[in-house]
């Protein structure tokens, strides 16, 4: 299966299936000398693991990570880092009824057409559990970025029609509610809405936003590896993401140039912008402002209602899905978005190191 490797210099290869023995990731290109422990990675994995509240699947997984290689005496060695998480609570029998039929909204049909064979247990590689490897790698990338003064903060911006207004965002509230919303009032309203949808055996869409601060100007590789293009690719590769916005996003359509342009000014010796409609990127490179990316997630396709579908033999049937499923994807995907952004920014920072001769001189003429 191609397409499981991401990155050029900081590379991430995820592996494993939802109902296999385990899942994991191999990270290559991580600099040596970074203090790293299983606890550092576990903090990230705990943010996405199931069964933490009423709005997540009841699948009972500890998602405990083990480091197999690449760490010695608590520090990265510069060699490939292998991380593994074992599956503990698979209930594959819940999926026996779909072995010969296609779930609406899922990738079952497409996998069958592509490979002529598929792991129907929980979706295999298309399951949300595939993101375990991404999050583990993101924890490592974030640790490196922290050494460079770069931080990432992601949160649930909207659930259904309930959206946190720009002037109501309080990042201190993100970890104070189970939906990771930056406003507790909106979180309470969203929780009530989710309970209503769950009673109707339905699911809800959401928006996850990520702010990246501390990235110096000039990071990103024109033309095809632009910063915003790579961020969009990374986040769009997360299952269920249907749209990406950078900065003002689609709102620029109704804007005019004189409003949309971010005027520059000098703050001492530093070039800054008075506004940030561009979302921290210009010409595919960072401009020194906070980078803002927004991802729209479709409603969870696994709903507990009767739905029309077809079998592998092309027979039309009515299906009722069983199993344990989230009524919403966004909140558990917050750390996944954050992780993919961290991986992307670190990879582009490494590529940027060779952009100027002065950079090489600082390294090799010290």
What positions do the PLM features span?
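N-terminal, positively charged regions that mediate nucleic acid binding
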Residues: 1-59
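Internal helix-turn-beta structural module
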Residues: 11, 302-366
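Short acidic, glycine/tyrosine-flanked loop/strand segments centered on an H-E-D-like triad
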Residues: 99-124, 307-325
């Amino acid at each position: 299966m191609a397409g499981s490797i991401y990155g050029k210099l900081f590379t991430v290869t995820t592996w494993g299936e939802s109902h296999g023995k385990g899942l994991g990731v191999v990270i290559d290109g991580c600099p040596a000398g970074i203090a790293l422990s299983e606890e550092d990675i576990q903090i990230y994995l705990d943010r996405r693991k199931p069964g933490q509240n009423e709005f997540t699947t009841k699948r009972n997984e500890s998602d405990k990570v083990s480091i197999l290689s690449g760490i010695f005496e608590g520090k990265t060695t510069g060699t490939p880092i292998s991380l593994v998480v074992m599956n503990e609570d698979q209930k594959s029998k819940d999926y026996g009824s779909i072995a010969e039929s296609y779930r609406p909204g899922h990738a079952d049909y497409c996998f069958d057409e592509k490979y002529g064979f598929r792991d129907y247990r929980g979706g295999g590689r298309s399951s949300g559990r595939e993101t375990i490897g991404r999050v583990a790698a993101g924890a490592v990338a974030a640790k490196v970025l922290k050494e460079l003064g770069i931080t990432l903060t992601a949160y649930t911006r909207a659930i259904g029609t309930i959206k946190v207004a720009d002037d109501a965002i309080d990042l201190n509230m993100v970890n104070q509610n189970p939906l990771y919303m930056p406003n507790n009032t909106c979180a309470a309203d969203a929780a009530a809405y989710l309970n209503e949808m769950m009673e109707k055996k339905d699911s809800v869409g959401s928006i996850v936003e990520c702010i990246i601060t501390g990235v110096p100007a000039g990071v990103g590789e024109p033309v095809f590896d632009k910063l915003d293009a790579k961020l969009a690719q990374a986040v769009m590769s997360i299952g269920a993401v249907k749209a990406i916005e950078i900065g003002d996003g689609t709102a620029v359509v109704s804007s005019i140039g004189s409003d949309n342009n971010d005027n520059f000014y000098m703050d001492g010796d530093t070039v800054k912008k008075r506004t940030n409609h561009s979302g921290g990127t210009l010409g595919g490179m960072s401009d020194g402002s906070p980078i803002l990316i927004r991802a729209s997630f479709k409603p969870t396709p696994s709903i507990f209602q009767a739905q029309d579908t077809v079998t592998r033999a092309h027979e039309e049937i009515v299906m009722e899905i069983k199993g344990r499923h989230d009524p919403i994807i966004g909140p558990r995907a917050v750390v996944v978005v954050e992780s993919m952004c961290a991986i992307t920014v670190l990879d582009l920072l490494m590529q940027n190191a060779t952009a100027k001769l002065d950079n090489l001189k600082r390294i090799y003429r010290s």
